[in-house]
């Protein structure tokens, strides 16, 4: 009997471990890699870095296009426009085939990734999902007067309450999304103008006076990421006097604030390795590492951290961020010294209590609850981004299940063990 209970408990625990690992994360590139008919869609997710953004989020639905539908979209438009169109196919809520046919009132508006980019005007970043007659489900722009030009065709993959991948027969086209002007070389390469407008005039002036702006501009076509300190960041305590640096050191410092690749926020959130900068060379690493705190991205130099504050521009293949601290490379300013460990407290000898003649019996005090242990308020590294805005009629239970999966798993194991061993 005991052996049977132990085996049952083992099987139950194993099944829960499977569930726990299932809800822990997803990789859209791997999900689509086994299906050749989505190879073009998958390739564009990687080129535009939307794959990283999708992987950094939870409770999400991706509406995929087969190669035929994708060619009609990608063949006629630049990469920046394709990215906007594809971001409209990423719904910030979980929709599986069952939920599509159980919409309250048969229709709903749901938020998409496009709405979070800042490019969507009004409600152009929302999608209309409608359960049609005959078991069909239509998708269209939420803009007034828009038609349901796209239809659900089949399910591709579901990781319950985490990610759902559904195929649709045509892209969802919001008014103006395909006619949006591609970033011109003059517009994007006017980096100093963008920086000055964003409150980074000191940084912009240094780029011009040092000649590093030419390095930035020559990198634009292949990809460029800039971390621009604000004017206030240069006035902060601890920022070294740049006049004490050699010209070569100033150049290295400024180049340390840029990457020779397009790396938007979603890519930085999922990054695990050291990142090479424009200053990286054989003589020194000059690299950066990243961590996350909720939806925030923090850059680490070895000297001190700096938080991504705002996005100045994100137009494939160029992204410019403002940061709240000047990035100080350890190669120039040395690594931050770790605080010395606190000395161990010296134990005082325990005094021997004096013997009392006869103890007086005191009334039993009311038992008090022990104080709760201190709670670490800092988010763990790699913590998931903040939950996206739920669409109308979204399933709150689904979101709760995903977020609380570890706690639920622990509780279920405890209950199962107790019931089986009694």
From Swiss-Prot:
Residues 399-422 form a propeptide. It comes from the Eukaryota. SMART domains: FAS1. Keywords: Cell membrane, Glycoprotein, GPI-anchor, Lipoprotein, Membrane, Proteoglycan, Repeat, Signal. A lipid is attached at residue 398 (GPI-anchor amidated asparagine). Residues 340-374 have a biased composition (Pro residues). It is found in: Cell membrane. Glycans are attached at residues 27, 128, 162, 190, 244. PROSITE patterns: FAS1. InterPro entries: FAS1_dom_sf (IPR036378), FAS1_domain (IPR000782), Plant_FLA (IPR033254). Residues 26-172, 187-327 form the FAS1 domain. GO terms for cellular component: cytosol; plasma membrane; secretory vesicle; side of membrane. Residues 336-397 are annotated as: Disordered. May be a cell surface adhesion protein. Belongs to the fasciclin-like AGP family. This is Fasciclin-like arabinogalactan protein 10. It comes from Arabidopsis thaliana (Mouse-ear cress).
